[in-house]
């Protein structure tokens, strides 16, 4: 397309992560001229490590994704853990059905993003790495391109996939600077281990792996949680904490991270490992609230982290699958706009329609109350200790007479200092939120 002399491309996509690459690829596949701009010298260089990718959405874009893409391991075991200072209560779930087709994989973005970029180039996308977009070109309220240094690049539509600190969304007036209660800070390490050592310690084999979601003393009482998952020859482990609660605690994010790695249940798993990577990253904590607002302007759509498509339910932390899903919804709306030659606000708002009809919009609505539920401090300070006390009462076989489990649980509850109404309230809130 791009036949008009004052237009360089049909679409300019800013950001070469999962969202930006998927959107650019799909639009090029539909026959449009697309420019993908990436700030890093190569795609993936600005992304911290990777994560657990619930990857079935990628089969819609790249059939055989889990076989062809540079993924680390397939997650067939999921563990939910309550961590206390001297105890570790763990629910360990394994299911062969999660293996074929692959439900979730671990990825390292330094490997995945370049692969996605290559796929984009094969589809006809012009990929421009090492370029920082400075501002939008706005004429009569319409976004018509971007400025990068002294250069102007014009297009019918701009797609912003520039991450959680999206200055494009801020410049367009879609987002203001996020309050700290909507942000979380993640601190992650990647620890290298020989493949056999890793597989023996984590009880995984072949291409399969395990992911842990942890809560409690792992964040030293700060609202948030911890994660740990196996890559091919490394383990990614870290904490994610709500920024306002972390600041109020007086703790440093790095100290909390180190506290997790030294826990008696964690340290042996990482013993003699080599630190391959360490870093911090801001993420969205209240994604459902953010994405409920505007995501478009005439000639502009916002996708992925830039729009707030992250979801933490306490059991799973999702971002990449939602990023890919939002990219597909945006590509559908932009394709319709290009076919009609209409780049008005109304045309861009078709993005919202496609979102609401997709699993992305439906899941964000389903878990809209999850962030508020996860703010409850008892989640991080009381329930882990209660669980440990109950199990201690069950498994501690001293010389005193045994009691029924119900009696053990009731006695542990009485000693916990929790009020019955608080537990009922939290339970009801959890049912509604999750």
Q: Can you name each region flagged by the protein language model?
A:
Residues 99-118, 247-251:
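Short beta-strand to alpha-helix junction loop
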Residues 218-223, 232, 245-326, 343-349, ...:
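FAD/FMN-dependent oxidoreductases across multiple families
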Residues 9-36:
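N-terminal Rossmann-like FAD-binding beta1-loop-alpha1 element of flavoenzymes
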Residues 374-434:
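C-terminal auxiliary extensions adjacent to catalytic cores
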